[in-house]
Amino acid sequence: MTFCFSKALGAPIGSMLLGSKEFITEAREYRKILGGGMRQVGVIASMANKSLDLRERILEDHQKAKDVFDFISEKQEFDGFFKAEYKNTNMIFLKFSDGANSQNFIKNLEKEGVLSGLINDKTVRLVFHKDVSTDDLVHVKEKIYSSSLI
């Protein structure tokens, strides 16, 4: 199993590989064979360690996603256009109905300063993180609403 310190935890770089002693020994051998490795990685380790100290903050990101999900769920105007899915993470997935144009939706959001990701033709992903403020959440809700009406 791998664990990334930069995803959601906010460290600028770093991952951890987890496994049995035998597995880690084998992974180190492959790393040497492939020429991987870095020197003086203490500064990276310190940033990863700091991100672990702040790990409870990720719950705030989950709450941001839940807040936007609740907003979407309360609006009947979205029925027939897309359905939101939230699974207790910092992400919301918008599943678009047949005939609804997810790519235009993304373009309209982007024009308004809201970035999202196209997973496939019918699914858009919204990700919430430490740099999304309360004011940003209000902006995101407004732009999701107005972009869905176009």
Region spans (language model):
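Active-site C-terminal subdomain of aminotransferase-like
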Residues: 1-91, 96-97
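Conserved C-terminal alpha-helix-loop-beta "cap" of PLP-dependent enzymes
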Residues: 77-146
